Amino acid sequence: MGNGVQPLDPVAIQIGSISVKWYGVIIASAVVIALLLALSEANKRKMDKEIIVDLLIWAIPISIISARIYYVIFEWDFYKNNLGEIVKIWHGGIAIYGALIGAVLTAIIFSRIKKISFWQLADVVAPSLIIAQAIGRWGNFMNQEAHGAETTRSFLESLHLPDFIINQMYIDGAYYQPTFLYESLWNVLGFIVLLIIRRTKIRRGELFLGYVIWYSFGRFFIEGMRTDSLMWGDFRVSQVLSLLLIVLSIGIIIYRRMKMNPPYYMEDKFGKVVKKK
């Protein structure tokens, strides 16, 4: 590559003709970490851990499929003439919001089958979701995707970024905004916020809704910086959906507090979750 800048090798392991890319390794790591965290959260809420494992078994493949369908719908001008590409997910093209929609629908159906509270289940997995997204964005980093507009090396250096990040943002002769990093850091901060607010008097389901609000708020602004947004006419799909999710989540919180009076949770000083009315 010109300018003496070399990107990181996207292949983690190469065995003959078989290659394992860092993207897959990072996503798999995110899933494992999310599972371990969710199991810990389930234990705090005295929920059967097998419920979390069973949910994950269903949610992972369904989320991948829904993430792909979401992407294909908004890139239909390409896929309608290349139908064979629809199933070639390894060529890229999945969307986090599509995955989230699939995961939520799976959890709703799963909770009804298991006869447990969807909101309780959602609260258990909320911290796992946001930390998994924070980790997963580094897969985009390794693939040199999900970046922002063109910028300069001096600007990136002014952010005090390590050289390996700056060099990885050098793509086809130009430097780009590391929007993957902005979103990853936003999600890490969101994870910390969730850990803090669950020590306050919040109602069942509000930890999950807080996650949705936090992620959507950050995604709205970060999406405006990206160059690969899915579009709906003149609008960025993720920005529209972010606004809708923020309004919907706030509306659900207000409605449930006024009409349903759900129980609230707090953590004690030992990190155990206690339920009160």
From Swiss-Prot:
<keyword id="KW-0472">Membrane</keyword>
<dbReference type="GO" id="GO:0005886">
    <property type="term" value="C:plasma membrane"/>
</dbReference>
<dbReference type="GO" id="GO:0008961">
    <property type="term" value="F:phosphatidylglycerol-prolipoprotein diacylglyceryl transferase activity"/>
</dbReference>
<comment type="function">
    <text>Catalyzes the transfer of the diacylglyceryl group from phosphatidylglycerol to the sulfhydryl group of the N-terminal cysteine of a prolipoprotein, the first step in the formation of mature lipoproteins.</text>
</comment>
<dbReference type="Pfam" id="PF01790">
    <property type="entry name" value="LGT"/>
</dbReference>
<feature type="transmembrane region" description="Helical">
    <location>
        <begin position="51"/>
        <end position="71"/>
    </location>
</feature>
<keyword id="KW-0808">Transferase</keyword>
<feature type="transmembrane region" description="Helical">
    <location>
        <begin position="235"/>
        <end position="255"/>
    </location>
</feature>
<feature type="transmembrane region" description="Helical">
    <location>
        <begin position="116"/>
        <end position="136"/>
    </location>
</feature>
<feature type="transmembrane region" description="Helical">
    <location>
        <begin position="177"/>
        <end position="197"/>
    </location>
</feature>
<feature type="binding site">
    <location>
        <position position="137"/>
    </location>
    <ligand>
        <name>a 1,2-diacyl-sn-glycero-3-phospho-(1'-sn-glycerol)</name>
    </ligand>
</feature>
<dbReference type="InterPro" id="IPR001640">
    <property type="entry name" value="Lgt"/>
</dbReference>
<keyword id="KW-0812">Transmembrane</keyword>
<keyword id="KW-1133">Transmembrane helix</keyword>
<protein>
    <recommendedName>
        <fullName>Phosphatidylglycerol--prolipoprotein diacylglyceryl transferase</fullName>
        <ecNumber>2.5.1.145</ecNumber>
    </recommendedName>
</protein>
<dbReference type="GO" id="GO:0042158">
    <property type="term" value="P:lipoprotein biosynthetic process"/>
</dbReference>
<keyword id="KW-1003">Cell membrane</keyword>
<feature type="transmembrane region" description="Helical">
    <location>
        <begin position="89"/>
        <end position="109"/>
    </location>
</feature>
<comment type="similarity">
    <text>Belongs to the Lgt family.</text>
</comment>
<comment type="pathway">
    <text>Protein modification; lipoprotein biosynthesis (diacylglyceryl transfer).</text>
</comment>
<feature type="transmembrane region" description="Helical">
    <location>
        <begin position="18"/>
        <end position="38"/>
    </location>
</feature>
<feature type="transmembrane region" description="Helical">
    <location>
        <begin position="205"/>
        <end position="225"/>
    </location>
</feature>
